[in-house]
Regions:
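Glycine-rich flavin
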Residues: 59-146
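Acidic/polar, glycine-rich intrinsically disordered N-terminal extensions of enzymes
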Residues: 1-67
Length: 146
């Protein structure tokens, strides 16, 4: 199964401690300061999980983890984690990014593609990092595969 908005929202109810204005936020999914952005991100995951968007928004991964929570996630990951190996891969990944951006109109400052694109880009150049610090390169690879 591909990650849905509900799975994403549930994942935020994991006991994390969030503070706002000196107070503890009991549930970021319902708190007035966060609930709208939680709903906006959930909408992105709902879009990717629609059967008609499966190929546009996700790609098959070989390690069975999908980058989104384990084998139960159907061994697919969002294209934001895809490492392009050809011009066609790059164009396909861009189409997925455009589709998500059109959903939020560019007004979601830190959409899930933000960090994933940074991590994926660094992962593609990990040989440069490895030349300076093999342990950091291995940590990056572990993070990407997670």
């Amino acid at each position: 199964m591909i990650k849905t908005g509900e799975l994403h929202t549930q994942s935020l109810r994991d006991g994390r401690q969030v503070y706002l204005d000196g107070g503890v936020v009991d549930d970021v999914t319902t708190h007035p300061a966060f609930r709208n952005v939680v709903a906006s991100v959930a909408q992105l995951y709902d879009f990717q999980s629609q059967p008609g968007n499966r190929e546009l928004m996700t790609f098959a991964v070989s390690d069975g983890h999908g980058g989104t929570g384990g084998p139960e996630m159907d061994a697919r990951a969002n294209r934001i984690w895809q490492l392009p190996h050809s011009y066609e891969d790059l164009v396909t990944r861009r189409r997925a990014l455009v589709a998500w951006t059109e959903l939020h109109g560019g007004f979601l400052g830190r959409a899930p593609d933000h960090v994933a694109s940074c991590i994926s880009g660094m992962y593609m150049g990990r040989d440069v990092i490895e030349a300076h610090d093999p342990d950091r390169a291995n940590a990056l690879a572990d993070y990407y595969r997670y």
